[in-house]
């Protein structure tokens, strides 16, 4: 699993320190990445191994696909890496400098400030918002199936449900009337992020190209959603002495040691609107896909709803919403015996780590029972790892498990075709063309 020929240097005096594809052109590789990034990464990994260097000039660029390599980057060397990469810079065009994209200096105090909003008592209280969201969804499904089974787009249904729950649990507001507009704006904005990442000639957002104008209109709609959310809560904000406060209470607290600016508040709200519902919706959509294409597992879940956590955990392994995690190295260090120079771009791929036989038996199989003895410390990174582990992980797992358990108990959910659904490797993993399923109320 090594290259037949390894040059000493690539263009612009970039040293070669690890195996990787050679002999091709940058343009050829770029076309392959744009066409089908997941297949391209899998092919490169299978041919060259767990640490791969791409044939590009500066910055030196590496793909890390092993459990140990991922841990080295995300945990052991987290102080020697930065989020100042193209991936997060493009995402910041939408979210601003929120918790997801902020670099270490800005991130650390913000994480400390927001952590109380994700303590166990707040996570427990979020169950109420999951129940409310599910009740609304089931009323809608009952109306849709009054005349018999009907076909719905499960991807869109999970997007809308996750957004309502996120806004209720984190911000204490009901945005039911705005759900369609906010989800559409989110998808449009994220599509712009991906388009920019795949186009090295993309012009700055301030240049009024049709694509840039479309993306800016979507961002403006997200800004309007922030205004709506704050206005809806302004008259009902809990005092700083309240025993339990949600995230919006914390953000709007004027008595913070360093009160947040309007821009900082906006950035955090948009970050959690986007990340808080997009990732959960993606995980749920693929969980349903795995269930409807594995009827035996669907039956097990219907008979034992407590298996929902296992199903969701396995779905996150096979279809991790964040399929790549990037870092810029601040100093030189080694990964799996290979030198990674300072100022390199490192790409950790949960998609590949979760398919690595060093951590998983039968890695391509949907086997929820593999998690009956717990979640492994090494090789499972759908929420990242280390200091930058997703702050909303526990809330997302609770929310997703409740949704899978209840809907599987109350509804027959079936695939309408047996063909494999292609994956769109966008900011998160999404099904191309949605996820059509047939639903009917269980008698």
List the model feature ranges, each with a label.
Residues 2-18, 82-88, 106, 122-282:
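Cytochrome P450 heme-thiolate monooxygenase catalytic core
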Residues 29-49, 224, 305-336, 357:
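Conserved cytochrome P450 K-helix E-x-x-R motif and the immediately C-terminal K′/meander segment
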Residues 348-374:
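Conserved cytochrome P450 K-helix/beta-meander segment immediately N-terminal to the heme-binding cysteine loop
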Residues 10, 14, 45, 134, ...:
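Cytochrome P450 proximal C-terminal region
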Residues 279-302, 394-411:
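Cytochrome P450 catalytic-core helices
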Residues 2-105, 109, 128-136, 176-177, ...:
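N-terminal membrane-proximal hinge/A-helix region immediately C-terminal to the signal-anchor transmembrane segment
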